[in-house]
A protein has these predicted regions:
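Membrane-embedded and interfacial regions of multi-pass energy-transducing membrane proteins
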Residues: 2-274
Length: 274
């Protein structure tokens, strides 16, 4: 024992990859949500700026079949309606499913709720990591959808169907696989949100510090708790709707087609319930 070495037990700082790609820490994951959400938000804002640039003057100056322009030109411009529809679609889909919900719920909720209720971390830290990377995978599919062949033929790529994804436009008019990728992107974002909601609810109910009754929880914690329940109950309904869109497109079902006994208005009921 005279030769025994004393080993230090001080904290070892993780490397960059370990911390930011494999983290289960609620603060790190909250920061990652905000970072990715901010990046996607920048893309979405650029879309709406481009649309407003086009609307600024009468006629069509920028969205041309000859090629998208960013500076007004005297050259001939044949209007490209498909590009306009793509801008509207992805601005809405990205903002709703990949910016607002992930940043405000996933980002701020992850970072602040455990701090406010005195919890050391989220109830399921490893599931928290899974939730984040499902969100990143969904974001990647959304970006891939913008670059995939759409229903505009030679007019360009992407699904120009509007952010609400109404049939029959989504089931019959958009022949390219950009629409399918967009549906899968929303699926993955929804799965991420459902896992996150389960995590938030469990953390709120089971991990409050001793003495913190429900009446003593800050209102921000309550807002995350209530939002988590709404996500948990409503998102599976939307998942069912877009799954029916997917099968109508690819497997010959007629959930939304009157020709096969389907109801074209059913999707709208389901979407606006969500």
């Amino acid at each position: 024992m005279a030769d025994a070495a004393i080993h230090g037990h001080e904290h070892h700082k993780p490397g960059f990859f370990t911390r930011w790609f494999m983290s289960t820490n609620h603060k790190d994951i909250g920061i990652l949500y905000l970072f990715v959400g901010g990046f996607v938000g920048l893309i979405s804002v650029l879309f709406t700026v481009y649309m407003r640039l086009e609307l600024m003057e009468p006629g069509v100056q920028y969205m041309c079949q000859e090629g998208a322009r960013f500076i007004a030109s005297a050259d001939a411009c044949t209007p490209n309606g498909h590009l306009w529809n793509v801008m509207i679609t992805y601005h809405g889909v990205l903002m709703m499913f990949f910016v607002v919900i992930p940043a405000l719920f996933g980002g701020f909720g992850n970072y602040f709720m455990p701090l406010q209720i005195g919890a050391p971390d989220m109830a399921f830290p490893r599931m928290n990591n899974l939730s984040f990377w499902l969100y990143v995978a969904g974001t990647s599919l959304g970006v891939a959808s913008m670059l995939a062949p759409g229903g505009g033929g030679d007019l360009g790529t992407g699904a120009g169907v509007g952010w609400v994804l109404y049939p029959p436009l989504t089931t019959t008019a958009e022949g390219g696989y950009a629409m399918d990728l967009a549906i899968f992107a929303v699926h993955l974002s929804g799965a991420s949100s459902i896992l996150g909601a389960i995590n938030m609810i469990t953390t709120f109910l089971n991990m409050r510090t001793p003495g913190m009754t429900l009446h003593k929880v800050p209102l921000f914690g309550w807002s995350i708790f209530v939002t988590a329940w709404m996500i948990l109950l409503a998102l599976p309904v939307l998942a069912g709707a877009i799954t029916m869109l997917l099968t109508d497109r690819n497997f010959g079902t007629t959930f939304f087609s009157p020709s096969g006994g389907g109801d074209p208005i059913l999707y709208q009921h389901i979407l606006w319930f969500f």
